[in-house]
């Protein structure tokens, strides 16, 4: 039972907004600047690329390491009730980040933390999602001339769409009795990420994210 305390602890860790802390260090409240989102993209947009990358890796870490700890605990006690501890811990990390208790349940869009969770749960799916994210970002920026920061939204949505289907293709028996929780979890994470990016999708269709043409 003590091991299950990892779940609420992870929720509290996930609720720590590294984007807000980075903004605080620079004397800026990111909730009032840029996209007003407490995430790595907005941190990079408002504070600079270095801060954006720092927030990104910190958000990945708070999803990755608790899940790895949960997996170790579950594997050490295979006959106990800890079989679903990694998934519960993963859910706590993502929910904590997305609905942080420290900022009125207004958190980030869960992309970086979800990547960390995927790396800990299903690394093949993480690699496929990351590859699809990079490809779509490059197409958006290079071909459709989206601003670098604004190409992140479409890339994240596509990666989220790819996530559950990549799992179905790469995971043995994804609909097996013991594997159904993981499969359903990935579909729910994909839905959450897409819902969190609904404003990005709306802006894309309105063509408000188009970069200006180069000067003659």
Feature-to-residue mapping (PLM):
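Multi-pass membrane catalytic core of lipid/isoprenoid biosynthesis enzymes
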Residues: 45-71, 106, 135
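C-terminal ends of transmembrane helices
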Residues: 19-24, 94-106, 136-149, 197-204
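Cytosolic, membrane-interface loops and tails of multi-pass inner-membrane proteins
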Residues: 20-52, 107, 198-216
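Short, non-helical or kinked segments that cap or interrupt transmembrane helices
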Residues: 29-39, 102-115, 147-159
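Helix-coil boundary and interhelical linker segments in multi-pass alpha-helical membrane proteins
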Residues: 1-6, 67-88, 119-127, 168-184
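N-terminal signal-anchor transmembrane alpha helix
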Residues: 1-26
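Interfacial segments of multi-pass membrane proteins
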Residues: 44-47, 70-74, 92, 111-145, ...
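Loop-to-transmembrane alpha-helix initiation sites
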Residues: 127-132, 149-160, 176-186
């Amino acid at each position: 039972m003590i091991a299950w305390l990892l779940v609420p602890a992870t929720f509290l860790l996930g609720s720590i907004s590294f984007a807000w802390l980075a903004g605080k260090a620079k004397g800026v409240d990111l909730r009032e600047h840029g996209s007003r989102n407490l995430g790595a993209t907005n941190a990079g947009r408002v504070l600079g690329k270095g801060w954006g990358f720092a927030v990104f890796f910190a958000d990945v870490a708070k999803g990755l390491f608790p899940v790895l700890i949960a997996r170790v605990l579950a594997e050490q006690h295979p006959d106990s009730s800890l079989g679903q501890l990694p998934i519960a811990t993963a859910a706590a990390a993502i929910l904590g980040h997305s609905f942080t208790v420290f900022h009125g349940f207004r958190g980030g869009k869960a992309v970086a933390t979800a990547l960390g969770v995927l790396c800990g749960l299903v690394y093949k799916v993480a690699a496929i999602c990351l590859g699809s994210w990079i490809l779509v970002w490059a197409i958006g920026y290079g071909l459709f001339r989206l601003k670098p920061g604004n190409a992140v939204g479409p890339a994240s949505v596509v990666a989220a769409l790819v996530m559950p289907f990549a799992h179905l293709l790469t995971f043995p028996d994804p609909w097996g009795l013991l594997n159904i929780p993981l499969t359903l979890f990935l579909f729910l994470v994909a839905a959450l990420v897409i819902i969190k990016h609904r404003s990005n999708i709306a802006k894309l269709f309105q063509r408000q994210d188009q970069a200006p043409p180069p000067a003659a």
